[in-house]
Amino acid sequence: MAYNPITPSKLIAFSASYVPVRTLLNFLVASQGTAFQTQAGRDSFRESLSALPSSVVDINSRFPDAGFYAFLNGPVLRPIFVSLLSSTDTRNRVIEVVDPSNPTTAESLNAVKRTDDASTAARAEIDNLIESISKGFDVYDRASFEAAFSVVWSEATTSKA
């Protein structure tokens, strides 16, 4: 039993890029209260978000029969997901100073602005992700997955001699 036909352009569909929709939405809604002002808050959020995707389908393992899954490598969700991860990846870039032991007032103010910008960007991308998923972009069940990627599940056949 396997999916057919498989071409290089379809291999991304079989990657560990799926999250159950309810799990992802619950995580995103709960994350709206996250303290993105601290590096620890951004790190914790990014690590938790990065741990959500998993592999639910393989060339030899059929897409789950029940439930809806967000495909984070899809054409709509991928740029939002990557932007969200990037907005939380500010370690060692928030404060860029000439003399690290004695930052100037301007350098400190710039660091605060960068932190605020990262927080604003993260919150905006969380909202964008929730909205896109709610509209059904890159969200699949078995039938829509097989139709979207033009693959057919072929049952094993036995030959009679």
From Swiss-Prot:
Record InterPro entries: TMV-like_coat, TMV-like_coat_sf
Record-linked Pfam families: TMV_coat
SUPFAM superfamilies: TMV-like viral coat proteins
Keywords carried by this UniProt record: Acetylation, Capsid protein, Helical capsid protein, Virion
Species of provenance: Cucumber green mottle mosaic virus (strain watermelon W)
GO molecular function, one term: structural molecule activity
N-acetylalanine modification, residue list: A2
Gene: CP
GO cellular component, one term: helical viral capsid
Lineage of the species this protein comes from: Viruses, Riboviria, Orthornavirae, Kitrinoviricota, Alsuviricetes
Function of the protein: Capsid protein self-assembles to form rod-shaped virions about 18 nm in diameter with a central canal enclosing the viral genomic RNA.
Location in the cell: Virion
Family as reported in the entry's similarity comment: Belongs to the virgaviridae capsid protein family.
Name by which UniProt lists this protein: Capsid protein
